[in-house]
């Protein structure tokens, strides 16, 4: 059903936006505070977070859509007075997307935590692992071999608008998708597992019902 598919896509988008803003708050505040001096209302900052996150980290979202939706959001929560400010700040961020090399700002990690890590592990080690800190691990849909192989599972998932890639006896899917809502999951065609658990089971030659 097209309507349900659209709803699921909206839910996935909103979920990615909420988690993304939470993870990248330090980076977002750097850009917002660069153009706004002094305190701003929490609702206004939230609208700016949402717009700035889309501009900086969601390449598929057009700038105009990110800015317009944030302005509309502010109006919907009674912040019409600040709509022009939000519009102006987001346009400035859109024209100035370069994230500085400062480790705290670049990776959205509190400065005191970075200082502690550097003291414990050294600056080179910290710089090496920080790029991975915000990476989202992929999901592994393990095919239930009673019913399907990985290629057949991929086909079933694609029928639910899920994009993935088939390997051995599993399908790798980018995170941010609710696989439990798919018809394939409800029909028991696969189960969800992280890579470490999967590798442990393979190493132990785990059999069904073990």
Language model segments and positions:
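Class I Rossmann-like S-adenosyl-L-methionine
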Residues: 1-178
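Rossmann-like S-adenosyl-L-methionine
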Residues: 152-210
């Amino acid at each position: 059903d097209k309507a349900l598919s659209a709803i699921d896509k909206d839910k996935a988008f909103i979920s990615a936006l909420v988690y993304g803003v939470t993870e990248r708050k330090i980076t977002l505040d750097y850009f917002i505070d660069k153009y706004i001096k002094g305190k701003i209302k929490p609702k206004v900052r939230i609208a700016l977070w949402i717009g700035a996150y889309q501009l900086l980290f969601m390449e598929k979202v057009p700038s105009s859509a990110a800015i317009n939706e944030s302005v509309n959001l502010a109006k919907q929560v009674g912040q019409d007075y600040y709509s022009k400010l939000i519009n102006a700040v987001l346009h400035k961020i859109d024209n100035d997307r370069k994230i500085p090399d400062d480790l705290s700002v670049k990776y959205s990690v509190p400065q005191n935590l970075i200082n502690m890590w550097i003291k414990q592990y050294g600056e080179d080690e910290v710089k090496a692992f920080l790029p991975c800190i915000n990476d989202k691990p992929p999901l592994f849909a393990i095919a239930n071999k009673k019913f399907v192989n990985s290629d057949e599972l991929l086909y079933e998932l694609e029928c639910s608008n899920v994009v993935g890639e088939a390997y051995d006896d599993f399908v790798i899917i980018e995170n941010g998708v609710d696989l439990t809502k798919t018809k394939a999951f409800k029909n028991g065609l696969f189960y969800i597992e992280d890579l470490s658990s999967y590798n442990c089971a393979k190493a132990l030659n785990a059999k069904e019902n073990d």
